[in-house]
Amino acid sequence: MHFQKCDYLFDNQVKLRLQHNAIRFRLKRSEVEEFARTGRVEEKIISGSSVNQMFGYALESTEKVSSLKATVRPGAIIVQVPPETVMRWASTDQIGIEGEQAVDNQTSLRILIEKDFACIDGTDEQNADTFPNPLIEERKLSEISC
């Protein structure tokens, strides 16, 4: 897997990226723990005082699904994940959970949930509560051996 430099500066929030018919969530350590413990993590963006000016997104652990399932509706995205998948991911060094959801005969929605790694060039504050980045460790080892 390829690790990239961080292109965002948000702290302590489930990170969401929407691109090319794909949904990607990144969770910090405490969020992975919360997801495993409570079965849900969520965030919202509020741009005004009315309900129409709010956008929410959530990950939900439920036995109602056997694979990743996304529901997109006005003002919200909810991705459901089987509980055993969540527990295996949260309790191991598995980096992510990935799936595809058929939309029609020619289109699918890619869903990816990842552990958030420390940014290579990030500050201590930006890297708080993240998972160790293997590239940082490799860099440290190569500096020692030179």
Predicted features, each with a name:
Residues 28-30, 37, 82-84, 91, ...:
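Surface loops and adjacent helix of pleckstrin homology
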Residues 39-41, 48-69, 73-75:
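Conserved loop->alpha-helix
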Residues 96-146:
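C-terminal charged interaction modules
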Residues 1-11, 52-62, 113:
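Short, flexible domain-boundary/linker segments around small modular repeats
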Residues 66-103:
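Mid-chain, well-packed structural core segment of small domains
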Residues 6-12, 36, 46-47, 107-109, ...:
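Accessory DNA-engaging acidic/polar modules
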Residues 28-50, 89-105:
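Extended intrinsically disordered, low-complexity coil regions enriched in Ser, Thr, Gly, Ala
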Residues 16-18, 23-27, 77-81:
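Short, structured motif recognition centered on aromatic/hydrophobic residues
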